[in-house]
């Protein structure tokens, strides 16, 4: 396994390719969707949220999180460690492990023969009462207007 300090790319926790690393290299706990969320520091190394909280050290005017692998400091966001970016690759890998398998989508060939006869329910919100505009019944040959009184009646 390559390490970021050895010149390799920082993976999940800095200990290898993203598909291999799903645990924190500090506490050896597997990442999860609650207390051990994978948080990425500015240097690119990833550790669980619980360990990053322990690394968060107050300085005189700002709080900094020193990376235990490369020692680069990451400023603590205003909302704390929970506001650091998630390591999305690790998070999605953990989420995929935890969620039940999804059903396969229907093949497109089975949908080709069925005609759409009406709009699926819930697609658009129900509209309230619509204004009613009366249809013009008369046409004036003189001015071309559709709203003139009936032919043969006196014009005003």
UniProtKB/Swiss-Prot annotation:
Pfam families: zf-RING_UBOX (PF13445). A zinc finger (RING-type) spans 24-71. GO terms for molecular function: zinc ion binding. The lineage of its organism: Eukaryota, Metazoa, Chordata, Craniata, Vertebrata. The keyword Repressor does not apply. The gene is RNF224. Keywords: Metal-binding, Zinc, Zinc-finger. This is RING finger protein 224. The keyword Amino-acid biosynthesis does not apply. InterPro entries: RING_finger_domain, Znf-RING_euk, Znf_RING, Znf_RING/FYVE/PHD, Znf_RING_CS. Gene3D superfamilies: Zinc/RING finger domain, C3HC4 (zinc finger). It comes from Homo sapiens.
